[in-house]
């Protein structure tokens, strides 16, 4: 097995998926950034959730807002619902794993807040319940999905935004999700604090 050849194949596959995403995603990423900035300007916050690698993405996004992205600026209110192991395990034990995010949203979410819901398949049951809880709390949802959008896509309201990666391969979807998250962070900073150029 030629490992370097395989590495080149993987890089090329990632580049091709990002090129396909470039053709379709910019309007949705822009709209998602506007939704998030509107919430932040109106004293709202952004909650985020996902499973596995998507949980890591939720935490990555939250940390970029709470700390900083590429410039010095004030901290922005963002909470990853994936980080409190005591809360997650108690909800999973006493109720079900499907409710680990929705119960937190019902407690923490307020009208005008935003939920960043991340699932490569769009079919994660606990993320679907999170979206339902966010709507109950009059929050706007930004969904990062892939494939056909799954069950998440059918739940979204007109004011929600879906950023659906045009791929069926989990790793490629995750790679574009991370790029989309970095785009959102950049656009949020530029809209709130101006361009650095």
UniProtKB/Swiss-Prot annotation:
It comes from the Bacteria. Its main location: cytoplasm. Gene3D superfamilies: Glucose-6-phosphate isomerase like protein, domain 1 (3.40.50.10490). Disulfide bonds: none annotated. NCBIfam families: PRK13936.1. The reaction produces a racemic mixture of D-glycero-alpha-D-manno-heptose 7-phosphate and D-glycero-beta-D-manno-heptose 7-phosphate. This is Phosphoheptose isomerase. It comes from Pseudomonas paraeruginosa (strain DSM 24068 / PA7). The gene is gmhA.
